[in-house]
Amino acid sequence: VFLRSGGTSAGFSLDWRHSDERTERELTTELRGEIVTLTPVTEAHVPDLRRIRGTAEVGARWGSIDDSPTWPFDDPTTTCFTVLEGGVVRGFVQYGEEEDPMYRHASVDLFLDPAAHGRGLGTDTVRTMARHLLHDRGHHRLVIDPAVDNDAAIRCYKAVGFREVGVMRGYERDTDGEGWHDGLLMDLLAEDLT
């Protein structure tokens, strides 16, 4: 399952504000699912995350890790978490937030170690993050945009309650930089979460 793009989240609510400033509490929030724990990315996680992102299967979706020497700390507009299973690094999930009150929503991207596929970690990761964004961060709508041929990810997102909105033609540059591929826009409203 290549997820680009249960349990309950932490037992407290976070206030959202119209700002890119993150509080210490937001940056240290640990989210617990039925199988996974999502914890803010630390320097200690980076070697494992870069190894996973560097696998052929994940790299085919996310691009070369060599193109991003400061990843995962290169985008201040996203909040990044490490996916842990029993303390072992299994993947990465990030979210971004549109703060304009007329369009407020969050977007999610993630990947998992190919060695951990088929055990429900993807579904638990997406569900855990969705609960956090809907309940703790105050969003009513989430979006995710897998490649149209990423059947495993699409199945995972649908299992959590995401619905297909439509195909975005020529949406994303191919990882080889030679062409473009279509993306599938999917969204989830708070009442859709399973």
Where would I find each of the regions flagged by the language model?
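Conserved catalytic-core motifs of GNAT/GCN5-like acyltransferases
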Residues: V143-P146, R163-H181
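Short hydrophobic/aromatic beta-strand or adjacent loop that forms the aromatic wall/cage
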Residues: T78, H181-L185
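Glycine-rich phosphate/pyrophosphate-binding loop shared by adenosine-nucleotide-utilizing enzymes
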Residues: V36, V88-F92, H181
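A short, well-structured alpha-helix characteristic of acyl/acetyltransferase catalytic modules
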Residues: L14-W71, L189-T194
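Conserved active-site alpha-helix within GNAT-family acetyltransferase domains
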Residues: T123, V148-G166
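Acetyl-CoA-dependent GNAT
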Residues: G59-H117, T123, H132, L189-L193
